[in-house]
Amino acid sequence: MNLSLCIASPLLTKSNRPAALSAIHTASTSHGGQTNPTNLIIDTTKERIQKQFKNVEISVSSYDTAWVAMVPSPNSPKSPCFPECLNWLINNQLNDGSWGLVNHTHNHNHPLLKDSLSSTLACIVALKRWNVGEDQINKGLSFIESNLASATEKSQPSPIGFDIIFPGLLEYAKNLDINLLSKQTDFSLMLHKRELEQKRCHSNEMDGYLAYISEGLGNLYDWNMVKKYQMKNGSVFNSPSATAAAFINHQNPGCLNYLNSLLDKFGNAVPTVYPHDLFIRLSMVDTIERLGISHHFRVEIKNVLDETYRCWVERDEQIFMDVVTCALAFRLLRINGYEVSPDPLAEITNELALKDEYAALETYHASHILYQEDLSSGKQILKSADFLKEIISTDSNRLSKLIHKEVENALKFPINTGLERINTRRNIQLYNVDNTRILKTTYHSSNISNTDYLRLAVEDFYTCQSIYREELKGLERWVVENKLDQLKFARQKTAYCYFSVAATLSSPELSDARISWAKNGILTTVVDDFFDIGGTIDELTNLIQCVEKWNVDVDKDCCSEHVRILFLALKDAICWIGDEAFKWQARDVTSHVIQTWLELMNSMLREAIWTRDAYVPTLNEYMENAYVSFALGPIVKPAIYFVGPKLSEEIVESSEYHNLFKLMSTQGRLLNDIHSFKREFKEGKLNAVALHLSNGESGKVEEEVVEEMMMMIKNKRKELMKLIFEENGSIVPRACKDAFWNMCHVLNFFYANDDGFTGNTILDTVKDIIYNPLVLVNENEEQR
């Protein structure tokens, strides 16, 4: 199938592009002979992102600044310790009377009303505490009275601890003779809800949670409970508001030192959490990897991960007192080859932590990289899926719809599975530039999300698409030149074979690896059909003999035109690989590629003879041959000569290398046999399911056998994952190991619903990777 002829490239239709980025891409196709303006834009964008790795930015919090402003001077209790914070409150009230990140003047139904209510009330209390800012207090009270009903609306997203903190602030305001024109019933209802929430926390031993929101406890404040969660920097959970309340209630010098350090760094206003640099930098790495642009920032990413690993080894509180940071650090460190255990994450993961959407989401991501031996200690981590399902079953407000979409995608497309380029496309299209996070109050960080990431990701995606289209055209010409299209018995799957590698080895510099992978994928498909239906035993044997002899006279030594075409195509591909691989490896690998092909064809011949002779092997005998005959060897093994590292003979002959291949191929064979069982059973072909039924325990039915085999696949996958991720004792370079892992993702994709290439929906995905333009969902929603 010539995909490029049957699909007109939609990239030529610029009206389909997102408006904000079409001008950038248009520039890349103009100004011939001059410096490409797009490259200049991209280089500038990359420089800005590189600088962000060094400079972490986080928005200031009016809520936390208000609590710091309430702190009395140790030397003069009737004076504020931080008058500069009071001045900031006076000068930073919004024109609707509120304080916070959102101005509600033109958007009265904005979903952050509860956050604005608690921030505004905290600021009012702080100003009243020191009898300043009467005008600001009155404007703030007017805002609260107009919006107080939102405090009890379930459809409004709640900051962490709102049901305890906001009623606590109301009590504080009442003690300061601040008169809110609210119904007594509403006030009583909130206090009752607060009491129930406090009882629930105490009964479930949620002291850590109560310490984090301790500024809302009022008369129930317990320093003996809170001080257990004081960190080395003097703070309570790195929270300025909780730390300020701790100093107000119990003049702890560590708390004051922390607050002084905050003001030294930030001036007259503070963020809602500090330090937060480690989490933010890890979020940068995660975002950049998800958007498919990590190849631009390898040095910066390595620096972040090295620093994170140092903190992990030293048991830094930034990691181990926060579930989200711990889960994110564990996942990124493990998949990048650092030796880390999930035990610290398991220790801090509890039911309360998983009720937070981001904590449950990150923990769920982490659950997919647990090894087999981790499962017993990681039971709480594995429960995260249940909490995510509960989250998306609840009514979503407008702000939570974005996180709900993330959750739905996480459950449908688990991290560390799926094809990299498909995931990248989905992540780009769903990317939210304005990624507001909610703790006790909302905050933004341009390091976590910004237009530069999106701009670079979109341009990089389109650049790769243009490369893919040219490579696919070249492959289609190669198929015709080698007469493979004339073999009527063979499936023509050029686009599918190329797609499988473009979706995994996507970087522009990996062109040789993609061509090698795709050519051998095309050839293994044709050869498989030849050994299956297209050739006689004599022809199959003759083809093997020609490859063994190598330097043959095709007119004399090939017994048929089919053998002639196949041998010449094989020789052309293998010689090309040998010549190109020499440039990468500085040695001749042709003999290894030939040997890989011979191993495959001999295994296929063995199966053909078994079928001819009606021989039924044992299940073990079948599998020892079938993992080779599944035909992944010629696809993956030659391709890894082109991914970067040099591979010695010692490496390619090592037990580690062989185990990688066997684990990958066994998964593929089992998936294939499960999905093709009914068809192959009717055709009388050998199949692992059929052999399992005939050789296994009596009375077992197909469903039981398939369930056992799926569990075997799952275990093999975890075993392979461990081999891929772990570096201790490994001699196979990580980039090479990743090729085996990528092929597993390819197999899962092709066999998700159908038997290999037969899926009707796969063509649309092929188009998405090679041809179709991106559709930026969030941008389109904003335009509407």
From Swiss-Prot:
What is the protein's known function?
Involved in the biosynthesis of ent-kaurene diterpenoids natural products such as oridonin, miltiradiene, eriocalyxin B and nezukol, known to exhibit antitumor, anti-inflammatory and antibacterial activities, and in the production of gibberellins phytohormones. Catalyzes the conversion of ent-copalyl diphosphate (ent-CPP) to ent-kaurene.
Native organism taxonomy: Eukaryota, Viridiplantae, Streptophyta, Embryophyta, Tracheophyta
According to UniProt, the name of this protein is Ent-kaurene synthase 2, chloroplastic
Q: In which pathway does it act?
A: Plant hormone biosynthesis; gibberellin biosynthesis; Secondary metabolite biosynthesis; terpenoid biosynthesis
Family label: Belongs to the terpene synthase family.
**Cofactor dependency:** Mg(2+)
Its recorded reaction(s) are: ent-copalyl diphosphate = ent-kaur-16-ene + diphosphate
Per the record, the domain comment is: The Asp-Asp-Xaa-Xaa-Asp/Glu (DDXXD/E) motif is important for the catalytic activity, presumably through binding to Mg(2+).
| Entry-linked Gene3D superfamilies | 1.50.10.160, Farnesyl Diphosphate Synthase, Terpene synthase, N-terminal domain
Q: What intrachain disulfides are recorded?
A: none
**Cofactor mode of binding and number, as noted:** Binds 3 Mg(2+) ions per subunit.
Transit peptide location:
1-28
The residues listed in the UniProt record as binding Mg(2+) 3, with positions renumbered to this chain, are: 672, 680
Which tissues is this chain's protein expressed in? Answer: Accumulates in leaves.
Which Pfam families would you find in this protein's record?
Terpene_synth, Terpene_synth_C
Glycosyltransferase keyword on record? no
Taxonomically, the superkingdom here is Eukaryota
